[in-house]
């Protein structure tokens, strides 16, 4: 057995393990039982000098017996891994990069990293641009997808913050305008901003707002909003009418600013209104564009004119290549030529229609288009257009449109009728036309279209992984026809994997056969389908070139060539994936096409040179500049010399040193991490904050103020290097020792096994019985039945008298048959009895007589030997014990005296009939035969045969040959030899009696009537002994073994509580120590070796205690360790709450002895220490076998019991005391709840004066959430993402508050479920808690509370993910409300589980759930650790979603692993399948070289870098699907999702044929979980 020793910690070798919880790892070692003579070992609370406990791991188990089938599957799995190493390495890289992206980490592709090259993060450009925009009007020229909108959002937040400060000073109100060029962009930008900024905001475009042209409207807009997103035309009109003035605007943001030219509304706003305003009253300007050029003009001239017109300066990247770390240019650019189509390709159908309806206005544009399309697209496309045109709208609508067109010109009725008739004839003509199926035939399709199909076929066939393609066309009809063409069977057969859709603008054209407008919601729905892969090919018009947020693609095709440089740049910018291709289609021999490409390339070169020629102060350097020059003045000033080695750290060298250190941090393959530098302007110059990646032990540092940005950057790096050196993360040679200096025990195997078992001593009797000796006074406890009638005969309470008063013991049920039970109340009687010799002697005789007559145990003992005494009570079960003044008045002294004076009741054969009623009769020769008499039978004599149906006695003589089966022989149980010496009176009375059941265990709730029903019989009393103990007392004495067993179990549990200093409620104390099966901890498994009649086991209390333990230790760590990061917090908490710690501490205390693991034993309930003269001896075994994990679980159950005990008084103190006793660590020495806040020291950042924006945020939250913050800065910190520089508001990120809030929310959810569902088992509670605390729900809750608008982040990917998620959940909510209305309910009665079905769940923006938990942590801290505010939050905002918990009954079962298990077991009925998970070797995931891209040895960083685990589904020895992830849990989940996708649509027959399944169809039992033997193969991982 593992014990604590003072050994250095040695990381364990990789062994088979499975994840067993948030903090623990469960060892799948062999289930073996080891006898340990030293039950506690040397498990002392050993701490090293640094306060970290040192434990050895469990000893290596004996080899586990594995079936031949599993060995074969394991060998097949390992062989498959060896054969597919390259595939697995590629999958792992993809998984790592995707995981980083989902987490909001801007992962940089790895490049050659050396000490001379300092990587500049793309965020630095954004920060620098933001800082510049704060100082002056700026035009941001950055590539498509580089986060320009993020900069706009940051600037809006900064401007509004300043605006709030100005209003407090009494200045007039002003608002910001975000101007766009297209209506669709109004909706998109407003949607993005409202989802990421918590300010009132309006969207305006001419077609959606009535009354926009009025002074009243604009007055209201000005008063109620901080931002207006609108088309430029609307603002221009409002300014023209003076409904709003330029001095009422504080910020103008021009999206796609290159449109500012000539008479464009952008230009009119500047020329007509901005210029006329006084300089100091003008708003700030921010222009956003990918290129300042939008026409066929000299780029230098166009850029200069744009700067002049917008009164701004262009700012662009000095090193555009740096931005390509995140903005990937196409890997390949191709130009593909096609042959010009014949100009005279007009089709016969087109000519017929032109002749018939060519004169009508309705058909002019369609005819022009089809004439052109016949040449450019092919004859099939031209004719297909008419088929769609007349199919799309019925004849009645076409006739109506014709009539409307003629009404405009006041045509005569005859003309109108003629035109309508022509339309009808055209419709008939098209319907009668024979349309040929599409084919790749030059007579049907143009060379251009055939070339497009070939390109698509080539790209989709050769591509690996998901393909995303955008094809740019000039006209919407072209887009629609091409998309339709790809759905034709012949064409689809060439590209079966393609799923095409059209993305066009919101306008309409007369030539379009689709006349309905496409709104922003429809566009967004198409884009989301494109992102999810439901669509993988978009035919798009110019709407997709700029503005719309379209996911990255790997194939971009210009079917119709661009006209301007900006179109070229923007369409090419859509190809941002690393493997992307940009393909331009040009006509062979077309000089104009060739020259257009050359002009675009030339203009791009000129533009680049123009940007390069900009003054240095106009370039975004990312804080990377000529540091040699800047640092000459610093020489000899700030540097640090390591005393031991003489190594010197200077300002310049600190950048290199920090970069090299960062390179050693764990990171996804093929990527590099880099420090993030954030420079802000402060009084006296510039100050920089450096923020390290999450894996760094020190997260950030702030440098001193300097006059230049470059030196400020060095200063920050210098400070962080000093901090790393001080903490020991840099060695004396300034080299990283990071892998050796991570938090100790981070990878320790801190779980204990549920299979590894050991034998321990077991306490059978409580400490109370150890007090023996002379009796001076006695305390009484009455055992009373609440429903005595269920016993089946008359009874009365029994008194137990002891030398010390029994503590209050919980009531419990006794079972007397089917549906017959009664609770036993253990009533302590006030006062005591002064014990005189006579009373003591009578009690002793009665007690020993009861043991002898009722239980056939004759003891040699005196009063000094007995731990307790029994006495009948003078009174019934209904006695009001409040009237009892002293135990002496309740003792039936008369009965005691009679029993004491009479060994048996005298019998003369002459007694009257009433003598034979209700006597307790004992067979002195057979201890199993005891009877209750009913009455005398005058109609029977001893020699009469025993009537039929009477149960035969068990003695040998009755079964012998020649024995007469009469009443006399039935009554005589002597052996054959002795029977001859006995002569019985032949005419003595026969008595009808009942043979009493030998059952002693009435705690078993499975008892049936036949198990305990007395058996009718007929006796003579001469061979018997009539006991002096009254029958009603005997009836209660028969229950006494069960009663005393439960009472002693309770007293033993209370002894353990006393040992810990805990005053627990007795029933909860017993429940916490009750283990009724070998696998009590496996809630969803069938119980092994189940012990009946033990009452409630510890499972529910453990579930509750686990959460409280997590909460209590979390609060302690948050309070006591304010200067560490979230990672260190998790490690610290893990060391406190891990099962290994609880197990070791329990052994040290000796709790294993007190655990109740055995049910009632009829041999062990008797008092100890008595000499047995007659009767079967007691079972001497006093040891039990316990799993290590069971002992740890009891510790958590004790905490749960303490929590419930304390809650009766509304106090946490008892539970806090229990936590302290269980964890035994200096980081948790609190003994009352008040101790937490008593040692909490408010950090300076919390108590500093809040600015106006922070106060405004607190005010809004007070109105919205119902809690008013005393410290608004605490609220703001709860929404500050780690990517947001702390320098901006001098606040930390939300990570520490999230760590705290997570535990608080978990506790309040568990507490609610525990109380709401008192009969629910832990498995049910756990599954439903999963729904309540899942990220999936918390993201939904965050949306409902509007938290998504408040997150401050510098990551464009996070903002994008938030916007996409909010769009999706808004649609899901709207759908749920509509479903409620359709069902006859109100919209507010929608089903609250709508969030479960959101498809975005696989890529949830985790920051949304994080800020919910951080907010909970913030209100808890702000309220001075008032837990009620957390409960109020839960009741107000969470409970409405869970009023009907049955909505979430299947939430846990929807886990993909469980789903696959059920599918294999029940649908396919396959028994030969197995799910494996195995950690991959480093050389598999990192490449055979064994080193990462930055030179760090992979093995060195593997100590903290999450292991690379492959999970695979094997069916009949064949690998069907696989997935790679950072842990076994995630790998299994990913693998299961792939398996579901593969198997869901597969029939049983197809499954058996494809996978070679020949199982006989016996379904496996899978119920809400996964069979361990079949799913948990080899899993390797770490404890963290």
Swiss-Prot record:
Domain Helicase C-terminal residue range list: 448-621
Similarity comment: family membership: Belongs to the helicase family. Dicer subfamily.
Lineage summary: Eukaryota, Fungi, Dikarya, Ascomycota, Pezizomycotina
Residue positions binding Zn(2+): 1470, 1516, 1557, 1559
Gene Ontology terms: biological process: defense response to virus; regulation of defense response to virus; siRNA processing
Gene giving rise to this polypeptide: dcl-1
The Dicer dsRNA-binding fold domain, residue ranges: 654-744
Domain Helicase ATP-binding, first and last residues per copy: 129-310
SUPFAM superfamilies: P-loop containing nucleoside triphosphate hydrolases, RNase III domain-like
Record-listed Mg(2+) binding positions: 1298, 1410, 1413
InterPro entries: Dicer_dimer_sf, Dicer_dimerisation_dom, DSRM_2, Helicase/UvrB_N, Helicase_ATP-bd, Helicase_C-like, P-loop_NTPase, PAZ_dom
Organism domain of life: Eukaryota
Its EC number(s): 3.1.26.-, 3.6.4.-
Residues flagged as site, Important for activity: 1406
Gene Ontology MF annotations: ATP binding; DNA binding; helicase activity; metal ion binding; ribonuclease III activity; RNA binding
Keyword Transport: no
Cellular component per GO, a single term: nucleus
Alphabetic keyword roster: Antiviral defense, Antiviral protein, ATP-binding, Helicase, Hydrolase, Magnesium, Manganese, Metal-binding, Nucleotide-binding, Repeat, RNA-binding, Zinc
Region spans: Disordered: 31-60
Function comment: Dicer-like endonuclease involved in cleaving double-stranded RNA in the RNA interference (RNAi) pathway. Produces 21 to 25 bp dsRNAs (siRNAs) which target the selective destruction of homologous RNAs leading to sequence-specific suppression of gene expression, called post-transcriptional gene silencing (PTGS). Part of a broad host defense response against viral infection and transposons. Controls the expression of the non-LTR retrotransposon Tad in the African strain, Adiomopoume.
Keyword rRNA processing recorded: no
Protein known as: Dicer-like protein 1
Coiled coil: none
Domain RNase III: 1052-1207, 1258-1424
Chain residues that bind ATP: 142-149
Organism expressing this protein natively: Neurospora crassa (strain ATCC 24698 / 74-OR23-1A / CBS 708.71 / DSM 1257 / FGSC 987)
């Amino acid at each position: 057995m593992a014990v604590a020793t003072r050994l250095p910690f040695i990381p364990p070798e990789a062994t088979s393990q499975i994840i067993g919880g948030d903090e623990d790892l469960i060892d799948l070692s062999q289930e073996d039982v080891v006898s340990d003579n030293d039950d506690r070992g040397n498990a002392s609370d050993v701490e090293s000098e640094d306060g970290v406990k040192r434990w050895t791991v469990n000893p290596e188990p004996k080899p586990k017996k594995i079936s031949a089938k599993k060995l074969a599957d394991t060998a097949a799995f390992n062989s498959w891994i060896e054969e597919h190493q390259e595939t697995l390495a590629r999958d792992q890289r993809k998984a790592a990069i995707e995981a980083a992206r989902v987490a909001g980490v801007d992962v940089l592709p790895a490049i050659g990293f050396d000490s001379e090259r300092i990587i500049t993060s793309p965020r630095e450009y954004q920060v620098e641009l933001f800082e510049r925009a704060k100082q002056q009007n700026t035009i941001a020229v950055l590539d498509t997808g580089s986060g320009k909108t993020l900069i706009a959002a940051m600037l809006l937040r900064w401007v509004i913050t300043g605006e709030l400060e100005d209003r407090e000073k009494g200045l007039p109100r002003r608002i910001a305008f975000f101007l766009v060029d297209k209506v669709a962009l109004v909706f998109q930008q407003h949607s993005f901003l409202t989802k990421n900024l918590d300010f009132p905001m309006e969207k305006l475009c001419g077609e959606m707002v009535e009354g926009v042209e009025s002074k009243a409207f604009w007055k209201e807009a000005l008063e109620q909003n901080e931002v207006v997103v609108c088309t430029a035309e609307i603002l221009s009109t409002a300014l023209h009418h003076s409904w709003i003035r330029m001095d009422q605007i504080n910020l103008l943001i021009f999206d796609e600013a290159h449109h500012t030219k000539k008479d464009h509304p952008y230009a009119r706003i500047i020329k007509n209104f901005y210029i006329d305003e006084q300089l100091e009253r003008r708003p700030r300007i921010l222009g956003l564009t990918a290129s300042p050029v939008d026409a066929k003009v000299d780029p230098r001239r166009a850029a200069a004119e744009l700067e002049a017109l917008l009164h701004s300066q262009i700012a662009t990247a000095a090193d555009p290549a740096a931005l390509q770390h995140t903005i990937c240019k196409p890997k390949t650019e191709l130009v593909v030529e096609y042959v010009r189509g014949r100009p005279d390709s007009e089709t016969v159908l087109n000519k017929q229609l032109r002749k018939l309806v060519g004169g009508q206005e309705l058909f002019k544009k369609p005819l022009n288009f089809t004439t052109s399309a016949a040449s450019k697209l092919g004859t099939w496309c031209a004719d297909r257009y008419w088929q769609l045109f007349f199919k799309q709208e019925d004849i009645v609508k076409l006739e109506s449109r014709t009539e409307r067109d003629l009404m405009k010109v006041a045509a005569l009725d005859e003309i109108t009728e003629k035109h309508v008739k022509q339309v009808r004839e055209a419709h008939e003509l098209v319907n009668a036309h024979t349309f040929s199926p599409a084919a790749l035939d030059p007579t049907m399709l143009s060379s251009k279209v055939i070339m497009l199909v070939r390109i698509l076929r080539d790209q989709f066939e050769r591509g690996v992984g998901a393909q995303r393609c955008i094809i740019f066309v000039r006209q919407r009809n072209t887009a629609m026809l091409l998309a339709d063409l790809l759905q034709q069977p012949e064409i689809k057969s060439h590209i079966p994997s393609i799923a095409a859709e059209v993305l066009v603008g919101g306008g309409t054209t007369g030539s379009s056969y689709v006349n309905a407008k496409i709104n922003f919601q429809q566009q967004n729905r198409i884009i989301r389908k494109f992102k999810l892969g439901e669509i993988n090919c978009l035919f798009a018009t110019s709407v997709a070139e700029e503005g719309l947020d379209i996911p990255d693609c790997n194939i971009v095709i210009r079917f119709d060539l661009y006209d301007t440089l900006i179109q070229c740049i923007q369409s090419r910018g859509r190809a941002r994936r690393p493997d992307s291709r940009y393909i331009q289609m040009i006509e062979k021999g077309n000089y104009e096409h060739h020259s257009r490409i050359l002009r675009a390339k030339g203009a791009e070169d000129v533009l680049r040179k123009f940007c390069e020629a900009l003054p240095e102060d106009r370039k975004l350097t990312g804080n990377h500049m000529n540091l040699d020059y800047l640092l000459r003045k610093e020489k000899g000033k700030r540097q640090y010399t390591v005393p031991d080695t003489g190594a010197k750290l200077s300002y310049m060298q600190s950048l290199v040193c920090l970069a090299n250190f960062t390179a050693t941090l764990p990171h996804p393959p093929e990527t590099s991490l880099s420090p993030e530098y954030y420079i802000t302007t402060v009084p006296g110059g510039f100050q920089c904050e450096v923020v390290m990646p999450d894996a760094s032990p020190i997260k950030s540092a702030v440098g001193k103020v300097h006059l230049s940005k470059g030196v400020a950057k060095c200063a920050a790096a210098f400070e962080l290097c000093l901090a790393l050196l001080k903490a020991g993360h840099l060695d004396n040679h300034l080299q990283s020792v990071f892998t050796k200096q991570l938090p100790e025990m981070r990878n320790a195997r801190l779980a204990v096994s549920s299979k590894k078992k050991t034998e321990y001593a077991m306490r059978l009797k409580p400490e109370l019985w150890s007090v023996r000796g002379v009796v001076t006074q006695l305390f009484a406890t009455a055992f009373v039945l609440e429903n005595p009638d269920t016993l089946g005969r008359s009874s009365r309470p029994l008194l137990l008298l002891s030398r010390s008063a029994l503590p209050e013991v919980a009531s419990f049920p006794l079972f007397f048959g089917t549906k017959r039970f009664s609770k036993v109340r253990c009533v302590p009687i006030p006062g005591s009895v002064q014990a005189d010799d006579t009373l003591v002697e009578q009690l002793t005789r009665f007690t020993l007589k009861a043991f002898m007559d009722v239980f056939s145990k004759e003891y040699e003992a005196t009063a000094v030997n007995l731990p307790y005494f029994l006495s009948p009570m003078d009174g019934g079960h209904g006695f009001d014990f409040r009237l009892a003044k002293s135990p002496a008045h309740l003792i039936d002294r008369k009965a005691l005296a009679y029993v004491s004076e009479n060994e048996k009741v005298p019998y003369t054969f002459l007694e009257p009939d009433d003598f034979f009623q209700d006597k307790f009769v004992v067979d002195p020769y057979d201890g199993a035969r005891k009877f209750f008499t009913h009455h005398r039978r005058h109609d029977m004599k001893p020699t009469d045969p025993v009537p039929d149906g009477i149960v035969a006695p068990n003695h040998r003589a009755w079964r012998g040959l020649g024995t007469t089966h009469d009443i006399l022989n039935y009554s005589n149980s002597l052996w054959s030899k002795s029977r001859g010496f006995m002569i019985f009176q032949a005419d003595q009375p026969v008595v009808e009696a009942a043979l009493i059941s030998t059952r002693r265990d009435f705690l078993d709730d499975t008892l049936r009537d036949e198990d305990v029903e007395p058996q009718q019989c007929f006796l003579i009393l001469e061979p018997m002994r009539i006991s002096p103990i009254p029958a009603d007392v005997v009836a209660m004495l028969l229950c006494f073994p069960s009663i005393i067993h439960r009472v002693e179990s309770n007293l033993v549990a209370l002894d353990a509580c006393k040992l810990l200093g805990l005053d627990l409620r007795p029933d909860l104390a017993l429940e916490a120590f009750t283990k009724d099966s070998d696998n009590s901890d496996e809630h969803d498994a069938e119980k092994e070796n189940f012990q009946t009649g033990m009452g409630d086991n510890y499972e529910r209390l453990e579930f509750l205690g686990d959460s409280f333990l997590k909460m209590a230790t979390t609060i302690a760590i948050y309070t006591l360790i304010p200067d560490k990061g979230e990672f260190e917090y998790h490690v610290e908490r893990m060391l406190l709450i891990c099962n290994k710690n609880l197990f070791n501490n329990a052994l040290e205390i000796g709790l294993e002895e007190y655990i109740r693991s055995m049910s009632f034993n009829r041999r062990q309930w008797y008092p100890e220490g008595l000499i047995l003269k007659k009767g079967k001896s007691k079972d001497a075994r006093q040891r039990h076998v316990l799993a290590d994990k069971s002992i740890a679980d009891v510790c958590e159950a004790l905490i749960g019991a303490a929590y419930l005990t304390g809650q009766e008084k509304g106090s946490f103190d008892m539970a806090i005391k229990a936590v302290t006793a269980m964890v035994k660590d200096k980081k948790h020495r609190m003994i009352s709840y008040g101790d937490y806040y008593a040692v909490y020291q408010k950090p300076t950042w919390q108590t500093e004066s809040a600015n106006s924006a922070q106060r405004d945020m607190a005010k809004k939250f007070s109105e919205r959430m119902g809690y008013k913050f005393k410290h608004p800065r605490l609220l703001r910190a709860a929404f500050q993402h780690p990517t947001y520089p702390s320098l901006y508001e001098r606040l930390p990120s939300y990570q520490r508050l999230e760590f705290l809030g997570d535990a608080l929310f978990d506790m309040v959810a568990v507490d609610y479920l525990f109380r709401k569902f008192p009969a629910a088992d832990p498995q049910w509670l756990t599954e439903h808690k999963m729904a309540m605390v899942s990220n999936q729900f918390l993201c939904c809750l965050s949306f409902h509370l509007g938290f998504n608008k408040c997150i401050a982040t510098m990551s464009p990917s996070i903002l994008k993910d938030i916007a996409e998620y909010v769009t999706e959940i808004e649609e899901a909510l709207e759908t749920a409300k509509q479903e409620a209305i359709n069902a006859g309910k109100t919209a507010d009665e929608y089903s609250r589980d709508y969030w479960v079905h959101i498809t975005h769940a696989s890529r949830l923006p985790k920051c949304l759930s994080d800020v919910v938990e951080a907010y909970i942590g913030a209100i808890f801290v702000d309220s001075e650790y008032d837990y009620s505010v957390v409960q109020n939050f839960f009741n107000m905002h969470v409970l409405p979603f869970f009023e009907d918990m049955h909505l979430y009954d299947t939430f846990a079962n929807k886990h993909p692993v469980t789903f696959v298990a059920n599918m294999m077991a029940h649908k396919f009925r396959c028994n030969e399948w197995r799910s494996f998970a195995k950690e991959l070797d480093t050389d598999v995931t990192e490449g055979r070289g064994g080193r990462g891209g930055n030179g760090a040895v992979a093995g060195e960083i593997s100590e903290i870098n999450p292991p690379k685990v492959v999970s695979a589904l094997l069916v009949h020895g064949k690998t069907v699907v696989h997935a790679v992830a950072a842990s076994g849990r995630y790998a299994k989940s990913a693998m299961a999702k792939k398996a579901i996708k593969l198997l869901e649509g597969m029939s049983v027959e197809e499954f058996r044929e494809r996978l070679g399944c020949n199982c006989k169809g016996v379904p496996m039992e899978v119920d809400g979980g996964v069979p361990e033997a079949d799913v948990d193969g080899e899993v390797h991982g770490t404890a963290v």
